[in-house]
A protein has these predicted regions:
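Structural preference for alpha-helix termini/caps and helix-kink/transition segments
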Residues: 66, 74-208
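Alpha-helical recognition segments enriched in aromatics with Gly/Pro capping
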Residues: 1-127
């Protein structure tokens, strides 16, 4: 039919976002012909770059098979969330780089839930440590700075979220090891760093 799918997207982007947009995303199966058509149409019509950055995500598989109704392995995000909550799903999506295929299994989503519980426990323990601080050590502050640098390096590497998570869990290990001996100011720095890094990934939003 007319108008076609490709021109519809170019028209909507120009109307609502302008001639040049910052970021365009979609599945890898849309690179050709859809996104190439969008670029050709928009740049010819507008005389400028259509999108500054492109993100093409990998596909989601279920137990190493493509999800489809015909294979009887189809379910919705809401169905998973009803059982596990939304945050484990978010964490699960962060366990692989966005360009990589992602394989869903019950075991993996349960592992993600357990990993989140470790993060919540660490953060709650930090609050307790701050309230009852009696140490004088400041070594944890240096570990916080190292975690920030590793996290930033990971995110600058094409949003390498697996390495970003690894940086957070390295900080968790340091907090668990050093918090009892740390002074209050250092513990507060650790809490701030922890909140900043997990916040970038949209994690721990259920903390009160």
């Amino acid at each position: 039919g007319r108008p076609g799918w490709h021109i519809e997207c170019s028209a909507m982007a120009r109307k609502h976002l302008g001639k040049t947009i910052d970021l365009h995303a979609g599945g890898q199966d849309l690179i050709f012909p859809h996104h190439e058509n969008e670029i050709a149409q928009s740049e010819c019509a507008n005389g400028c770059t259509f999108s500054r950055y492109w993100m093409h995500n990998g596909f989601l598989n279920i137990n190493n098979e493509k999800m489809s109704k015909s294979a009887n392995n189809f379910f919705t995000v809401r169905e998973i969330a009803d059982k596990y909550g939304y945050e484990p799903i978010r964490y699960f999506m962060l366990t692989a780089g966005y360009r990589m295929p992602l394989n869903y299994t019950v075991e993996l989503i349960e592992s993600c839930k357990s990993s989140l519980e470790r993060l919540y426990t660490c953060r709650d323990n930090l609050d307790f440590a701050i309230e009852h601080a009696h140490g004088t050590d400041t070594a944890l502050a240096e570990k916080c700075e190292e975690a920030r640098k590793k996290f930033k390096t990971a995110m600058d590497d094409d949003l390498n979220t697996p390495d970003a998570l690894a940086a957070i869990f390295e900080l968790v290990k340091d907090i668990n090891t050093l918090s009892d001996a740390s002074d209050k100011a250092t513990l507060e720095t650790a809490a701030k760093t922890f909140d900043e890094l997990t916040g970038v990934l949209g994690l721990l939003y259920n903390r009160k």
